[in-house]
Amino acid sequence: MSDNSSNQFLLLLAAAQQQQQQQLLQQQLAKIQKATASSPSKSTNGTSASTSAVPSTSGTSSSQNEAAQLQNLAKMQQIQQLAQFGALMAAQKKQQEKAAADKAKEKEKEKQKAAAAAAAAAAKASASTSSASAIPGLSPEMLAAWQQAIQMQALQQMMMTPQKSQMEEAIKKMMDMAKKKPAGVASTSSASTSSSTPSTSSASITSSNNNAANNAASNMMNNVMWQLVAAQMQQKQQQQQKDTQKKADQAKKAKELAKQQQKEQDVKNKQQEEILKFLMAQHQLNHQKKHEKKQADAAALAAKVLAAHRAALESDSPEEGKKTNEAMLRLPLQLGWRRQTCVRSIASAGVKGDVSYFAPCGKKLSTYSEVVRYLTKNSIHYITRDNFLFNTKLVIGEFIVPKQTEADETQQEREFAMFTEDDINKELTRLNVLKFVPKIQASTSNGVHEDDIKMSKIEEPDEPLDPSELNDEFTEELVHSQIMSNGVDECKIREREADDLLVNINDVRHLPDFSRIGNQCLSSQGFADALMVHEFVQNFGHVLGIDLEIAPKLESLCAGLDGDANHAEQTLQLTRQLLRLALEFPGMGNEKRFGQGGGEMGLDRENFSEVMRLFLIDKGKRGEELSQPLLTCNFLSISPEQKASILAFLCDELVCSRNVVTEIDKNLDEISRLKGEKWMREGKARALRSARSKKKNDEKVVVVKEEQNHESDSEPPTRPDTPKKATVAPPTVVSVSPVSAAQQQQRKFTPGLGQCEVLTEQEESMSLQQMDSLIGDLHQEAQNINQKIHDTGLKIRSFPFGTDRFHRNYWMLAHTDKVIIESLATTSVNNPACNANEYASKDPPTLEQRVPGACETIDLDVIACVEDLVDDVVLLRAKADKKTRKRYRRIENHMKRGWWTMQNRDCVESLRSCMLSRGIRERALHRLLTKPWFLNELKFGTITIEPVGEKSDLELVRRQGWTRLNTAIDKLQCHLKMSDVSKPLPSITPFETQKPIVVPPTMALAQIVKDDMAWKVIDEEVDGQELDETIIRQKIIETADMVQPKFWRPKFQKLEDQDTCQLFEDWKSYVSTEAQTTSQLMVALQTLEGMIMWERSSREALCQICKSMDGDEMLVCDGCESGCHMECFRPRMTKVPEGDWFCQRCREEKSGRPMCMFCSRETGNLHQCQRCAYHVHQECSQDGPKEAINPETFICGHCQEMKQMRFVKRLILRSESEERELEDDNHAENGENTKNGHMNGMNGAIAIGVHNQQNGVKGNLKRKLEVPSIGGLPKNMNKELCQLMLDELVVQANALPFLEPVNPKLVPGYKMIISKPMDLKTIRQKNEKLIYETPEDFAEDIELMFANCRQFNIDHSEIGRAGISLHKFFQKRWKQLKYNFTKRLRRLHR
């Protein structure tokens, strides 16, 4: 049910109730009117019937009383209704006032009081009107008030109902009562009328009239009531709408207010959060500022100390150094420390006494050890031991002077007075003044002797001291009296020193335990040698031609030395490179056991160990000791420590190498240059500081002068100067003598190192801030240069930067980025003071000697524990006989051997805190570890050696060595059979006995020398089958027996009066019994090959002019079987001479006259070459312009070229591994062509010789060498060939004019003469673009370049001579490279 419907029901209920009450009132009024109407009739009829009036009078009076009571009751009901109406009106107003939230409570109370008063007044007024009206009917005003009261009563009931359901029930009950009441009323009214009718006879008439009147009145009242109800309902609806709107507005305002309050609350919360965050940030910022301020203060103090140290180091004058030291010593006093000196005596030389320091907490410190201990305990880092001084050289702090009292002279009781620095300085000044004043003998008239003078009473220190009192106080008597107590003082000093020693002994802290090097597989000495090899290779490998990317690192090197299969090959390659370099320089001696020195042999995989042994034997006693293990086994089979020692020895030998010495000299020059740069910057900084201080002083003088001028201007002009102002010194003006001025002018214009101390005009005109900035920049540059000096110095030499109590060295190396600590086992091998034999007579190596390899995995700490147990037993036995007792170890066993590293900077701090300040070694190390610049250079970390996994199978390596040796013997025998050096066999055909055509040069054993990949520990391509050593030895001797005696060199040839050659027999004995390893047998086999004169063989003939076998055609002498290229003659020989041909040497021997080896003429000015002993003409041996020849030092051009070619050949053999010969796996007995290109070429050469013989041409007269030809080279190989030729051309000394294209601006007319310019740069660009398809295309451009040179330049010009020399080199070298690449291509095609 809605609010409107409920209001309508309430109004209807109120109207029904009001109607019922009206009916009741009308009935009562009708009764009253009847009563009033009957009273006059009775009075008029009373005269006629007087006798019967008595009973009627009594009835009338009773009816009047009832009417009065009914009127009073009606009036009371009206008054009650009016009161209820007033109460309802007050309640409604009160609710309206409560709904208005914007009105104040005080106004609400006043309105409630006013409403209550108005209601009471209305009730009184209504009562008075009702009581005053004696009319029996209702007035319209009362009727309207009554209607309003009835309505307000219904409204009050509606408002007082708490719930909706209860209100509906109440409405239903009231409706039912309204329906029942009219019937009851009607019955009562009818009863009353019926009862009253018998009373009078006229009542029926009156009642009918009254009923009509009552009906009319009731109808009128109903109409008025319904009008009032409609108007009231309309007003109520309007009021409800207003209230609803008002409530909606209030709810909206309340929501807006709530939102606004919520927003305000959120804003407040945000503000509170921001304030809280701000407070927290402010607190954190304050805390951070305090921390930063604390750090800044500590940094400032440290900077101040560091600046004082630096100023002390940089100060040139002693005065500045003294001031700086004094400032450093005053720093603790500024921080709250006290320095107190107990004075024993004062003289002109200074103060003597005992110095003590008092910390801020009050603790007294009397020695350096106590100070250091206190600083370490309290973590004070901004001051150090250097800020304290326990002698009295400087007058700093407080001074306590003892004095004697005059009260009791016998007991010599002493009191003390406190003196300040100023007092002591005044006294010292007085004594120094008195020292130079002539002494005046004191008057003795008073009878007092000088010795009897007593020391006067010392006044308070605040008062000025009287010089006479001080003179009396510190007289010679005081000194004399103190002499008596010198003995006591000396005893106290000794006791104090003993106490200090005891304190130091008791407070000795154990050094921290550093981390050992992980997976240590070498002994201490072995790791030391490996570390030295690693540093040497990393430092000088780039100048020795060692590839540092391939070279093993320290971890891999140690594992490879221990025999790890994964790293053994890298170690073997490094060993080979070091040995090869050592053989080149410093080389070996000239001792030759079998006619051939070790340096003359090639270095290959098999003779490696024996060549190394021969090299070590040649290097003195140390080398002989290292070579002993190689006498019975190969290099790979010796112990890791022996390998490391040999590698270290090779590095020591290479230090004297030319390249290493040059690198060291270059580094020394670089250090000298850097020191000069640093000195110049420091000198410039000193000059700037001096100029800055001078400018600052000048500015101060100018300010003082301006102030003086201002004061003088303010004074009267007639006033004379006072003596005080007259004594004021004018601005300081340095008087410069003419000599010094001339020197300064000369320094300004004289360049050199002194120039850095001379400022330019621009520098002198700088401001103080600019000077400070420039000084800072110079200081930073000096520090950077100092770092470079340090890094460069590490490349030259490395020294340990400190030693501790265990004699352990601390290393900082250039290429090991960790601090390494070396133990006693390697640092003090030759130091008798800490000899390991004195500490422990027998160390664990004895166990290793008994059981080899059993102690390899024993940890060093375990060894130390075992040694401790052994030491206890030894010490117990030593106590038996004190006379024979020996001094045993004072060093802990676990510190004796091994290597350690520092993990981080905390290790430095812990190490520094545990060091002894009085230790000889640790004091220096501690001083260095406290310097910040040194700590910044240290690098920390750990080193872990690669774990040793599977080791190489040495037995398999040994078997493969014998297999390779057997292969080499087969190769040599095959080569002997294919040449005419071996003895003839019965199966040789007649045409094979004749001289065949010469084949390309190939040495049999050279085929064993493979590229770098062949240097493997275990070669998978080599069969490791077991061979009988006796058979191998016998096979080598049989190979020697195959050589014809005429091909032996003189050392292996027997003399005419002897049956055998003794050297040859010694060689056989060496092969049979003495040689114990495959390497030694390989050297013997190479010696055998070297003793054969291969050049006497027609197939191995060398050109006597160019000393090579490369060439197109070669003529072989029919007398000595030596060969000469046809192209080497001057002029060039184009045809093969008919008949027998003899070389120049055979002709000279026959005729006895010298002959030119080029042109074969005897005439002309001949010169003998000091190298090849041939006679040549100058014009034949030299191309281009002729130079003056010194006969004593003359060397022909071919010999000079041969020397250069040998050097180039060595370079090629190092870099070009493919140019070496491959092995021949097939045997020559099978009759098949071998895989080697030389053997194929040999068969082809024999076939050519047979064909020429069948054609009737003499094979012994025509010695032609055909270059092996094959199809065109691949593009990559062609490019590589051209690139190699270009690289060799560029490095030549005469290649400078041909490196770049000719500039037409610099050389006018060049393009007019040369139509097709060409240079090496253009050729290189074309080669990189793969323009050259064949080598001939490349050679055409090279020839074009030299043709242009000959066309534009004359032969005698500098460029002409350079072109001729370079062209000649190109022609020879190009043939060799083409031949090598052709052979390589043939091997690829097989």
Curated annotation (Swiss-Prot):
Domain MBD: 323-395
Keyword 4Fe-4S applies: no
Region (Disordered): 30-67, 178-215, 235-269, 705-729, 1218-1241
Residues in Bromo domain copies: 1273-1377
Stretches of the chain forming a coiled coil according to its record: none
Subcellular location: Nucleus; Chromosome
Keywords: Bromodomain, Chromosome, Metal-binding, Nucleus, Transcription, Transcription regulation, Zinc, Zinc-finger
Zinc finger feature spans (PHD-type): 1100-1149
GO biological process, one term: epigenetic regulation of gene expression
Biased composition (Low complexity): 46-63, 186-215
GO CC terms: chromatin; nucleus
CDD domains xrefs: Bromo_BAZ2A_B_like, HAT_MBD, PHD_BAZ2A_like, PHD_SF
Family matches, as SUPFAM superfamilies: Bromodomain, DNA-binding domain, FYVE/PHD zinc finger
Any Pfam family matching the protein: PHD
Knocked-out gene: effects: RNAi-mediated knockdown prevents age-related decline in the expression of bas-1, a serotonin (5-HT) and dopamine synthesizing enzyme (DOPA decarboxylase). RNAi-mediated knockdown improves behavioral performance in pharyngeal pumping in aged worms.
Bias type Polar residues, positions: 35-45
Tissue: Broadly expressed in the nervous system, including head, body and tail neurons.
Major localisation: nucleus
Classification via InterPro entries: BAZ2A/B_Bromo, Bromodomain, Bromodomain-like_sf, Bromodomain_CS, DDT_dom, DNA-bd_dom_sf, Methyl_CpG_DNA-bd, WHIM1_dom
Basic and acidic residues bias locations: 243-269, 705-724
Single GO MF annotation: DNA binding
Family, per entry: Belongs to the WAL family.
Subunit structure: Interacts with set-6.
Function recorded in the entry: Chromatin reader protein, involved in positively modulating the rate of age-related behavioral deterioration. Positively modulates the level of global trimethylated 'Lys-9' of histone H3 (H3K9me3), but not of H3K9me2 or H3K9me1. May repress the expression of mitochondrial function-related genes by occupying their promoter regions, working in concert with histone methyltransferase, set-6. Involved in modulation of the mitochondrial unfolded protein response (UPR). Negatively regulates expression of bas-1, a serotonin (5-HT) and dopamine synthesizing enzyme (DOPA decarboxylase), with aging.
Protein name in UniProt: Bromodomain adjacent to zinc finger domain protein 2
Organism: Caenorhabditis elegans
Gene label: baz-2
